[in-house]
Amino acid sequence: MQYGLDKTDAALWQFINALKNAGIYDQTLIIVTSKHGQSPINKAKLVKPGHFADLVCTVSNFATTEGASIITNAGNNCPEGPCGWVQDDDIGLIWLPDQSKTKLVADYLNQNAPALFIDEVMSGEELKLKFRDPLTDSRTPDIIVQPVYGTIYTGSTKTKIAEHGGFSFGDTNVGLIVSNPALGQKVVKTPVLTSQVAATILKALGIDPSELESVRKEGITVLPFLFDQDGLEDE
């Protein structure tokens, strides 16, 4: 981790020096963040039980359970017949070849949650509250499996110590740094959204953030404490 921090620090220093040499440092708003986090942050929590479909095969009732068979055979008929898929890492995404079996498979997963390192199974109406309906949009999996924190469904035994793509706190929360000579030092612990970055950039450029359709539809605001009395000025 220290190596990564040192490399990032050196890269930012080069960037800042270039801005200063060009005489535009004072007029530049620097925003540093990440598109995703990693999980687990705590290495002591790391568990790698194997790929999800392989793990299903280790459950004692696997051979006699339809739900288990559907998962392990999801991709067998691709591309000749009905095609499903299981995508895993620090989350499990399951597309079923027969979507009418969604509840049956979800029930199986819930019944065997401890053996499969499952914290939550999302399907049906609950899934549609957050994502598009998988019956009408094939990009949405039929079932989403959120594993117990620290679990990575992988066959890697050595190199993989963290992953991203899931819904854990470490996956979905990242740091965000905003810098400009006009801004005093401040630590803000109020949660913000990375979707606020675009609106903030527009405001700093003197453009009404509501010009963005997403700002209007989702009620997105600019990042707080930047355009206060002693902060940045609109262009």
Features from the language model and the residues they span:
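Acidic, His- and aromatic-enriched active-site or binding-groove loops in soluble protein domains
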Residues: 1-10, 50-78, 83-86
